[in-house]
Amino acid sequence: MIGNRVINLLIVATLALAGQTVLALELGQDCVNPVGEAGKCVLFRECQPLVDIYNKPVNTPDDTQFLTESRCGLYERKTLVCCAGVRSKGKTSLPESPNCGVQLTDRVIGGQPTKIDEFPWTALIEYEKPNGRFGFHCGGSVINERYILTAAHCITSIPRGWKVHRVRLGEWDLSSTTDQEDDFYADAPIDLDIEKIIVHPGYNLQDKSHHNDIALIRFNREINYSSTISAICLPLSNSLRNRKHAGLSSYAAGWGKTETASASQKKLKVELTVVDVKDCSPAYQRNGISLDSTQMCAGGIRGKDTCSGDSGGPLMRQMSGSWYLIGVVSFGPQKCGAPGVPGVYTNVAEYVDWIKDNIY
């Protein structure tokens, strides 16, 4: 094991790569991290999320930039960093970067099955059917130890006699009881009973524009994070909420229908370009659908889209080393993956206050 002094020298060298001026804050002072989230200026070794990023087998340029820009001062020649995401007492909190949106590997290549530990916040919603059978027909995203975020239509627009039954986390291959990739064996997925479901009060089943298509599911217990189960970040700060994503690359992941119209057994991912909602509105207006700023669009390239089995699942972007949930899969063209018609997503940034008001 490398001595503390050597580790500190390595950290200082890594954090100095960008050559930027370090804020001269004192130990314990309030600070703001690179993505605009509030934190405390602490010793590097006391900020476990940053230590975890530093200790990853391979650091991406975003990782290095985030580490560099997290510096906030020096204390007795030791590096201080702005550490965000301290959990508030008495109420379930939402994690902030770098306590969320981190996966052990950065191997995103669009249009392929995921690796076993990619996007560990993806969830499956299981339904109980009248014939005594069960099935997974919607997705969601882990946002902390007690909740997933999903689409309202996954709760209210389901066939007669169906009931939302449980939530599964840590899944990768539905055809296997033990997920394995190369020499890595994942822990068994967990099935969680549901304590409460909160559908946005503004969602109207009869509204074909699907405004306010967002819901929360609360587990009956807290979960423990692992390499295959963790939370994705939400855009909590004003700077993140106001960020424009149009024209930029994003990713969706889930077990939905493929271009062959059959559900995938393994978790899939697809790279999608975000489209300004004003630019994709005309494609839907002819069908009497009116989109607004609480929605966003992505995709529109033949064969690259999210399909019905992915409803409620995540649309995400990696920013400053962490993955952020920017959209929830809502609806799309009648023919999935139709060219020129992007899919529609609930714009998560518009619902951060609602989410914060409804978790406990």
Curated annotation (Swiss-Prot):
Keywords: Disulfide bond, Glycoprotein, Hydrolase, Immunity, Innate immunity, Protease, Secreted, Serine protease, Signal
Upregulation: Induced following a blood meal. Induced in response to bacterial infection. Induced in response to P.berghei infection.
General function of this protein: Serine protease which plays a role in the innate immune response against protozoan and bacterial pathogens, such as Plasmodium bergei, Staphylococcus aureus, Micrococcus luteus and Escherichia coli, by activating the melanization cascade. Cleaves and activates CLIPB8. In the resistant strain L3-5, involved in the melanization of killed parasite P.berghei ookinetes which results in their clearance. In the susceptible strain G3, appears to be dispensable for ookinete elimination which occurs by lysis.
Gene name per UniProt: CLIPB4
Description of how the protein assembles with itself and partners: Interacts with SRPN2 in the hemolymph of immune-challenged female mosquitoes; the interaction results in CLIPB4 inhibition.
Family: Belongs to the peptidase S1 family. CLIP subfamily.
Organism annotation: Anopheles gambiae
A Gene Ontology term for the protein's cellular component: extracellular space
Record's protein name: CLIP domain-containing serine protease B4
Carbohydrate attachment residues: N224
Recorded phenotype for the gene knockout or disruption: RNAi-mediated knockdown in the resistant strain L3-5 infected with P.berghei, causes a 5-fold reduction in the number of melanized ookinetes. Simultaneous RNAi-mediated knockdown of CLIPB4 and CLIPB17 in the resistant strain L3-5 infected with P.berghei, causes a 52-fold reduction in the number of melanized ookinetes. RNAi-mediated knockdown in the susceptible strain G3 infected with P.berghei has no effect on the response to parasite infection.
